[in-house]
Amino acid sequence: MPFVTIDLFEGRSQEQKNQLAREVTEVVSRIAKAPKENIHVFINDMPEGTYYPQGEMKQKS
């Protein structure tokens, strides 16, 4: 049962997230030979100011 977690800065539309989840599900199903109904995609919207690579806050580009 594959679980896929995607962390993105917030700002994508619901349609963009829906399309991303559908396409990721397709790819994982094809490559991992997993039934689509067993694939779970989690999309986490990260507010700006919550990402600190190397201890420095990362701004959206």
From Swiss-Prot:
Active-site annotation: 2 (proton acceptor)
UniProt keyword Nucleotide-binding, yes or no: no
Enzyme Commission no: 5.3.2.-
One MF term in the entry's GO annotations: isomerase activity
InterPro entries: 4-OT-like_dom, Tautomerase/MIF_sf
Keywords: Isomerase
Record has Isomerase as a keyword: yes
Family: Belongs to the 4-oxalocrotonate tautomerase family.
PANTHER family according to UniProt: 2-HYDROXYMUCONATE TAUTOMERASE, TAUTOMERASE-RELATED
Protein's name according to its UniProt entry: Probable tautomerase SPy_1139/M5005_Spy0861
Organism: Streptococcus pyogenes serotype M1
